[in-house]
Amino acid sequence: QSHVRISFDIPQYTMNVNLNGVLNLLEIIRKFCPKTKFYQASSSEMFGNCFDEDKCQRETTKMSPVSPYACSKLGAHTICANYRNAYNLFICCGILFNHESPRRGTNFVTNKVVKGAVEIKLGLAKELRLGNLNSMRDWGHAKDYVKAMCLMLNHDKCDDWVVSTMKTHSVKLQKPGKKIGKK
């Protein structure tokens, strides 16, 4: 379950999927195939509103989650570190910032905007409703993030790594109507 807002509606389900699911997999690896390399998709949401002095978030930045989703990801991240150290398992955690692809659901902002613009163009909708337009996000492409995941799993040593573009972008739309032929 990867939607922050929805995690407030279904916190127990979010924990079961994101934390207990990981714990179940780690137990199987520990008991039956300890040579397995495991990758955990952690989330920058684990940082909450904590930043280093230079306004960056890195592997050593304090983590202070502010949603059930972020708590579930921090729990999974922590149990991965515990299993890596206690059982000497090869477990890598990628602390991922936002990453997008055409496969991402329409309840996430980038595809929501595309879907809304198309619906307006086709006369199926008159407006597009969005949440906080002042939000700033570090957005990368899913293909680049998958490459980083592969590099982690092929590294000699397992560890935790932040995966980001190190650039933030506004959610504000810059004349989206022009792109679809609307004024």
Segments predicted by a language model, with ranges:
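Mid/C-terminal beta-alpha module of Rossmann-like enzyme folds, strongest
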Residues: 112-113, 155-183
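N-terminal Rossmann-like NAD(P)+-binding domain of SDR-like oxidoreductases, especially those catalyzing
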Residues: 1-99, 143, 153, 172, ...
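Glycine-rich, flexible loop/turn motifs
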Residues: 4, 53, 59, 65, ...
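Residues at or immediately flanking beta-strands
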Residues: 37, 90-93, 127-129, 160-162
